[in-house]
Amino acid sequence: MIRGRMLAIAILAAAAAAGITALIVMNPVPPIDVMVERDVQATNWGPLALAFPGFSWIGDAKGAVLDVLVFIAVLIWNRGAWVLAVAGFMTGAWYVLLSHLINRQRPTTALVLQVTEHPVASSFPSGHTIFIATVSTLLMLCLGHRYMPRWALPIGWAAVAVIVFDGAISRIYTGAHWPTDVLASLLITAAWISFILSIRWISDRAFAPKQADRSHARLAS
């Protein structure tokens, strides 16, 4: 069975990501990217900027270690959500595929105000953005919905939104990515996770009440 609303969100997000991808293939450096990047870099982000070095640091193998730690946490505290966690982390496969298919040059100081990071891979999409959005969302879906009281869920999702926004802005501020790289990455993540949630067999297991988990455990024993 399929959750129609989540599938519709997945289709819309995927279509938007495809549109941005087509745009940058036809015009790798659209003027809107340069304008937005310069505006972001000229802005004083205050306390949000304190986390920028952390978002830069989390790349490479350190991200894989965090993925493993999150998966272990899901196995311990919400075993029924392990399929959701594994499927969710497949956003990394989308990054690998698209970064090999689309070789986009990264921002340079000839066009933007600063470039403080110099990754060698394709600028499109933003692997950091996909990673941050995926991990934050999966933590909320797999553990937040299990243990947080209902009144606190909006607060939890607001925290996720702030973290994802801050991480996205950091990739533009450092000059590591163009704004369209970051926007497409958010849409790719939203499309994939929404698609997974649309599959009831996966989402029902992840959001099953604790009592149902104990019943399954007794049956298994």
Model-flagged regions — what are they?
Residues 7-10, 56-78, 81-86, 133-139, 143, 154-161, ...:
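Hydrophobic alpha-helical transmembrane segments
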Residues 47-48, 77-82, 149-155:
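Membrane-helix interface segments
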Residues 4-13, 67-94:
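Interfacial segments of alpha-helical transmembrane regions
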Residues 18-20, 90-97, 161-172:
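Aromatic-anchored segments of alpha-helical transmembrane domains
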Residues 112-221:
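Membrane-embedded catalytic cores of phosphoryl/pyrophosphoryl-handling enzymes
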Residues 1-64, 101-121, 220:
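N-terminal transmembrane-helix/juxtamembrane module of multi-pass inner/ER membrane proteins
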Residues 93-101, 125-130:
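Mid-bilayer segments of alpha-helical transmembrane spans in multi-pass integral membrane proteins
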